[in-house]
Curated annotation (Swiss-Prot):
Alphabetized UniProt keyword annotations: Acyltransferase, Amino-acid biosynthesis, Cytoplasm, Diaminopimelate biosynthesis, Lysine biosynthesis, Repeat, Transferase
Keyword flag Lipid biosynthesis: no
Gene that encodes the chain: dapD
GO-annotated cellular components: cytoplasm
Binding sites annotated in the UniProt record for substrate: 106, 143
Pathway as given in its UniProt record: Amino-acid biosynthesis; L-lysine biosynthesis via DAP pathway; LL-2,6-diaminopimelate from (S)-tetrahydrodipicolinate (succinylase route): step 1/3
Protein name, UniProt field: 2,3,4,5-tetrahydropyridine-2,6-dicarboxylate N-succinyltransferase
Length: 274
């Protein structure tokens, strides 16, 4: 793997001129195809947890961006649609049913998954869009019209509800994508973007919008944080009143309660939100 990383880092330094060197381009394309294959298999990933911290593997992002630079668009077809793209579908129309059986996943009509995406066992993909570099762990459901952005990381046993958006990021290289840790619920029509981390066991209500500048308010103390939802939080949309009379309040999200792991496992999502 160290040799592949070295080759990608060197190619990145000359990316503006890489198309002009046919010999280097042939070698690089082989390396990039192997990298995309490794992303598909979950051997490598854009972002991974080391201890309590998430680390971005910048070289993997560089590999994806170089793949865009060095790949020409082509026409793709399935039984009901055609499109013109640089990135092939992960599951083309002629995918053998045994591949789905062995992978133990379910994919319904209208589900679009680009190559370079890892889909673990027992994942259910409703009509939705999952972009290159995304990582979807075991037992998760990507519900109808949900969008999973490039490089977004979704943990085990999550439910990404209908119409919700999970932001991704390829550039800047050092930026984290959105990370949804294990056993999380993201409510319908919610949007989680700009590198937000939703920690394990959290429940995000319907219609919650969280970006890097969104105030995240603890209801019981009034404390304000940014950038992450603490583990086992229950979050709803809210408004912070203006300190000046007659001025409009501003949108925020509110941590209405935090529960322990045992309670989260026993209590239904609806009960937690109430």
């Amino acid at each position: 793997m160290s040799d592949i990383i070295k080759e990608i880092e060197e190619a990145w330094q000359i990316k503006e001129n890489i198309l002009n060197d046919s010999l280097k381009l042939i070698k690089l394309k082989s390396i990039l195809n192997e990298s995309i294959k490794s992303l598909n298999q979950g051997i490598i990933r854009v972002c991974e947890k080391q201890g309590n911290q998430w680390k971005v593997n910048e070289w993997v992002k560089k590999a994806i961006l170089l793949y865009f630079i060095t790949t020409e668009s082509q026409l793709y077809n399935n039984n009901y649609n055609s499109w013109y793209d640089k990135v092939a579908p992960k599951f083309p129309a002629d995918t053998d049913k045994n591949i789905f059986k062995e992978a133990a996943i379910r994919k319904v009509p209208g589900a679009i998954v680009r190559t370079g995406t890892y889909i673990a066992k027992n994942v259910v993909i409703m009509p939705s869009f999952i972009n290159i570099g995304a990582y979807i762990d075991e037992g998760t459901m990507i519900d109808t019209w949900a969008t999973i952005g490039s490089c977004a990381q979704i943990g085990k046993n999550c439910h990404i509800s209908g119409g919700s958006g999970i932001g991704g990021v390829l550039e800047p290289l050092q930026a984290k994508p959105v990370i949804i840790e294990d056993n999380c619920f993201v409510g319908a029509r919610s949007e989680i973007a700009e590198g937000i981390i939703v920690e394990e066991g959290s429940v995000i209500s319907m219609g919650v919008f969280i970006g890097s500048s969104t105030k995240i308010v603890y209801r019981d103390t009034g404390k304000i944080i940014y950038g992450r939802i603490p583990a086992y939080s229950v979050v709803v949309p809210g408004v912070l009143p203006s300190p000046e009379a007659g001025k409009p309040g501003l949108y925020c999200v509110v941590i209405v309660k935090q529960v322990d792991k045992t309670t989260r496992a026993k209590v239904s999502i609806n009960d937690l939100l109430r």
